[in-house]
Structure formats: structure tokens, C-alpha cells
Amino acid sequence: MLEIDNQTPLESDFLLLEKIANVLAPTQIIELILVSGETMREINRDLRGCDYATDVLSFPLEAIPHTPLGSVVINAPLAQTNALKLGHRLEEEIALLFIHGVLHLLGYDHEKDKGEQRQKESELIKIFNLPLSLIERTQDSF
């Protein structure tokens, strides 16, 4: 189940995100929060000590029955900018960020694992017919 807190003027169809949530965590609640760039910078600074606006952050919650799996926070204006720059729809960019964030909630960590998160993202991208994943874009830019 997906709970959405859209704190931006951005209007989007979240049906795809609900489908993704149902595939990744069919029995759990996932909170999606769409924020401005400034709000994302504040969250990143206050909680991670990084004074810049990033595209997506994940905050897992304790594994308590009937409580949310955690929160995925997406920088909506940056998602919009990246979608335009990369030539795909905003909904696709948000879906890519959402997948990336939810996988972190589920315990995947692309900085430490041996490619498991990248592999899972690739599988989901194929299932939902999405463009290049966040990890693949980052690795391809080096």
C-alpha cells in the first residue's frame, strides 16, 4: 500500500508507483513524500550532514507489524529537471527514484552489496518498461 504526501504543486499519476509498491512490498505500507529542492536540502543536511539537495532519500522504520516499511522522499523539481534532461516522462523518473528508494527500505545497499540492488532495479525496470536505472546512469557517467 502506498501513502502519498505531495508537498509540491507537482501533479502526477501515482498509479504506476502503487503497482511498484505492490510488487516490492505487497503487505506493507510505504510512505512517499514529494518535496521541494530546499526541503530536500534541509532533510539531507539535518539527517545526513550533507548540505545539498539530492534526488531521493529513504528512511526505514522499525520492523513492527502493521506499521509502514518506511518513507521515500523524492525531490520533485529535481526529478522534473532530470526527466527533461534525459528525455523521458516525469512519472518514469519518479518511478525510477521510487524503486531505488524502496529497495533501500528493503535492505539493499548499492554502495556495499555486490550488485544485488542494481540487478533488482534492472529486473523492475524491465517489468515496468522504464528507462535506465538510477544506479546505471550514475555508473555510466564515470
Curated annotation (Swiss-Prot):
Positions in coiled-coil regions: none
GO CC aspect terms: cytoplasm
Enzyme superclass (EC): hydrolase
Name of the protein in question: Endoribonuclease YbeY
Pfam short name (any one): YbeY
UniProt xrefs under HAMAP family: Endoribonucl_YbeY
Phylogenetic placement of the source organism: Bacteria, Pseudomonadati, Campylobacterota, Epsilonproteobacteria, Campylobacterales
Record has Transmembrane helix as a keyword: no
Cofactors required: Zn(2+)
Cell compartments where the protein resides: Cytoplasm
Family annotation (PANTHER family): ENDORIBONUCLEASE YBEY, CHLOROPLASTIC
Alphabetically ordered keywords of this record: Cytoplasm, Endonuclease, Hydrolase, Metal-binding, Nuclease, Ribosome biogenesis, rRNA processing, Zinc
Binding site for Zn(2+): 100, 104, 110
Enzyme Commission numbers on file: 3.1.-.-
UniProt GO molecular function: metalloendopeptidase activity; RNA endonuclease activity; zinc ion binding
Family: Belongs to the endoribonuclease YbeY family.
Cofactor details (free text): Binds 1 zinc ion.
Function summary: Single strand-specific metallo-endoribonuclease involved in late-stage 70S ribosome quality control and in maturation of the 3' terminus of the 16S rRNA.
GO terms, biological process: rRNA processing
